[in-house]
């Protein structure tokens, strides 16, 4: 759903976009917030629990001081590039987005290295010690994320999986940090990655293939948390079609 001029003016009780200072669009099923580019006076905006996948529209809100984006679909921390030019930004809530990955520490350090003026991140005060550590432990973001297309809709699955795919390629098991650092959040959402005991013992010959397959499965299960009912239905249909195709191949093999 696109955030429209009418929606903004109604919620902000304003007559013109350029005069809007505070806006609350919590849980509005939004995917497109491009109209934010027309709100230069915006200071506080709440966009939590939506389906927003890019931060580019708020890059022109030079007076923005508080940005709430919990539980959206921001795919990569590279999106933080669009916030680097906001001199007044002091409060950011970005938790429960795909970009947070499986390492809370790495995520927090990267955000603080990119946005050192923050005073509060994900409802936790930022300390001087954290800012110092972020210089060496956080990743440096120097360019805007590459995009396939110009829309502001949902991200491609390959982009959302980028960090987890990297872990799979390097042999790093996302189950390690996910089970230890974010089990509480997963309990709340009613979903956990598969435990090691759920996978059967395999020979050394199959170990590498099994490890990669487990990482892919874990990534998929983690991403399911971010989908709404419509998205889950699409996944269900795709899985059903895939299962039907595989069963057809098995029948053909047996016939031969």
UniProtKB/Swiss-Prot annotation:
Gene3D superfamilies in alphabetical order: Ribonuclease Inhibitor (3.80.10.10)
SMART domains xref list: LRRcap
Compartments in which it is found: Mitochondrion; Cytoplasm, Cytoskeleton, Cilium basal body; Cell projection, Cilium, Photoreceptor outer segment; Cytoplasm
Keyword Repeat included in the entry's annotation: yes
Tissue spec. comment: Widely expressed. Expressed in the retina.
Presence of the UniProt keyword Phosphoprotein in the record: yes
Record note on what altering residue 73 to P does: In SMDAX; patients may exhibit clinical features overlapping with Jeune syndrome; decreased function in ciliogenesis; abolishes interaction with NEK1
Subunit composition and interactions: Found in a complex with CFAP410, NEK1 and SPATA7. Interacts with NEK1.
Function, as annotated: Plays a role in cilia formation and/or maintenance. Plays a role in the regulation of cell morphology and cytoskeletal organization. Involved in DNA damage repair.
Protein name as catalogued: Cilia- and flagella-associated protein 410
Lineage of producing organism: Eukaryota, Metazoa, Chordata, Craniata, Vertebrata
Gene responsible for this protein: CFAP410
